[in-house]
Amino acid sequence: MTEPTACRSPKSTFSTLSLGVLVLFWSLTISTVTAEGGIIEEVIVVAKPIKASQLSSIEAKRNSVNLVDVVSADAIGRFPDTNLADSLGRLPGVSVERDQGRARYLNFRGAPRRYTAIAFDGIDIPGTENGRIPRFDSYPSVITSQILANKAITADMTGEAVAGYIDIRTFSPSDIEGISGSFDYGFGEQDLGGGDVDRYSGRLSFSNDRFGVLVFASETRNEQVTTNLDDMDSTYVDGGVIPSTIRTNNYLVDYSNEASGATGEFYFGSGGRIFYKYLDTEFLDFEERNQWQIDLRGIENPTPNTGYAPDARGNRALEYGKYNNTTEVHTLGTDFPVANWKVEVRVSDIELKSEYWLPLPYMGWSDGVTYDVTDPSDPVFTFDTPLADLQYDPIFSVIDFVNFWGRTNTENQQFKFDADTSNALGAFKLGAKFDQREALGGSAANYGLLAQYGLSREAVKGYEQPDRLWFTDVRNPIGGFYTDNKGLFDALVAGGVVFPGLEDADSDGLVTVDEEIVSLYAMQTIFTDFGSVILGLRFEDTDFRTVGWQLDAQGEEVPLTVSESYSNWLPSAHVNYDLNEETKLRASITTAVSRPGYNEARASAGISPVNQSVSGGNPYLEPEESWGLDLAYEWYFGEASIFAVSAFYREVDNVIVAGSTTVDGSVYSPAAQPGEQWTLTGSANGRDGELKGIELNFIDRLDNYMTGPFSGFGVELNLAAIDSSFTAPDGNEYSLPGTSDLTYNASLFYEQYNVSIRLNYRYRDSWLDTTEADVGDGNYWDEQERVELSLRYDLEELTGYKAIVYADLMNLSDYEDVRYTGNTRNPNQIETYGSRYVLGIRASF
């Protein structure tokens, strides 16, 4: 198996030892208290919000019919989480993937992003990205009342959940009778660059025995600086490193996630209800990129580590761009009894939008450059000419403007029916769902000249700000400075630059997809003396159609429509065995199917009859099919306490990765004879996918054993050891993208005297990011860690109002995120962003 070179920093070794010392200390403390006075059975009950949230989450887990981890709303409020990825990343076996430090994707039990399905209040949400991949940075944490992270799925859950199914429960008017509300305001600073941090949220509801209404809104906004050293290509020789190219960036980022929603309910006298629910979420990211690229490949007789390039070349790129992801959900539903049945009907309209627009002027230059790459992670490059005086030469960039852009809109309509009843064995449930999706998108890099928009290279230099050196506390390898990118963008727009429409997309990048999924299921819960058994069967029928291009006899592009249909029977079985009142065993066998993403399976492609090749989408991809086994032991040994260990195994066939395969060339061009095999480069099916691991979870509190000031201490610890593998189309064996061998979370908290303090540490080992066809060794992210501190003070005793003041301190370790190719000697991206601090107040009534 191709694996990254082992490289554990002293900081990580110290963190691992610290975790071990913490566990040892906790064990000794409990042993001492028990030996001296025995376990205290009667304690004084006091208001402890961390304890209340732990009780809520643990009891929900304990009473579930399947293997699940639960996050309560109170627990979310006790951590400095700004989106759902951060909140879920604290659960056992759940890891976070970040972009510029922001939690964005989830690797659920070490699985690729697309193996996790997501729902709001039981309504399945297609992936904002590629139709399959959830973007969790689009969903603020404050909109949720509870999160159910299902690790072993039942038949009433979507079959797409290979690794897990995350059901996000939002607030309902009937949660609290009468008028209720809450608000949150926080402000702070990002220490690198001094950017502002602002948080706002509010919720208001009313309900009685006839109707209920609820409205909410939230916004979190951050101004951030990111320093990024990437794409440093080097050759390792005896005596050191010879650099060839390097790109260094400094980003000024202004990003926000927003959410708003409303619910109206009318209650029937018979016990049913009819309701309408609306949810709108948006992630918006404005980004200024200041980039220098240096090319040293023309050096004659280069020397390792240090040297001089008399004729180095490169370019400078200046961008003011935007990324936007939105999710809009409208649901009309009703719940009502019919005879002995409880019936639920939902009709949902869902619209997803994902787009980016990056207009990018870039100018070429040539100059002498002295280099020092003795430390490849902190290189230094010195130009002969001061950067402010460096002239941009059209010889080195004839094309000096490119308009990068892309957009995908997905419309989804769902009809969902569920009904359950009691029978002689226990409970029986059945249901059906019709799911229709339409996706339309495209992307391009439209090249041009600044002169087309009324700008010269000299005019661009007028926007430079040499006195504004890059904000950085780590590296500025060239002494870079900022440019007024926003002013330059405004000038480009005034000159006619626009966000293009799909008619300007590259033909080989168009995404046109229609998909229909019909699902039926039935499940029987059998109640027994020892617990319960749940047997289920789900059937999913998929019709997939995509439109792309083929060549006619004259070599012109004409539409090509490819349709695929497949059906999947997905059985499942769950056993819950209560050993006694405190301990429980669980065992599950599940099956699932992961469909190709829209971009992967699009029919559009570039066609080359001369090379007998096709590059682009692969509409002939097979869906990934899996079966899995879960075993779990849960010990609820004290109030708000748990020790749990679980083991899991997943076998996945037809693993989809970037790569090459062969197709019938005559489908794409009459130049090929029927059956003639051409090479298709894009996505392909691998084989022999396997994912297995062990998870540990421990939560305990000293107030289960003692009273007094020290009884306020407690710990939350979880750990996952995971291994995965698959065989790529080229025959090489890799770990599955997203698998870290080791992940863990450690939290030490104290709550007493209206104060709650929580120190949290998160760690994940290195993991494979991509298996791009042109990168034989794969791209990996190196190990990552985060240290966070949360402080809360309850004001109710002082003021009579339910309110707290809080402080959140994030990324206190100021950790660098590093990506590399093949092994850690070849870093291709090093990101730093600094710590973040927020103060705020939260109140409710």
Regions found by a protein language model. Name each.
Residues I44-G77, Y105, R113, I123:
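N-terminal periplasmic "start-of-domain" segments of outer-membrane beta-barrel proteins
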Residues A85-D124, K151:
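Extracytoplasmic beta-strand/coil segments of soluble accessory domains associated
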Residues V96, I123-K151, G202:
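Short acidic/polar hinge/loop motifs at secondary-structure boundaries
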Residues Y649-E651, V663, Y668-T770, R842:
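Gram-negative outer-membrane beta-barrel transporters
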Residues F713, D765-T770, L791-F845:
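C-terminal beta-signal and adjacent terminal beta-strands/loops
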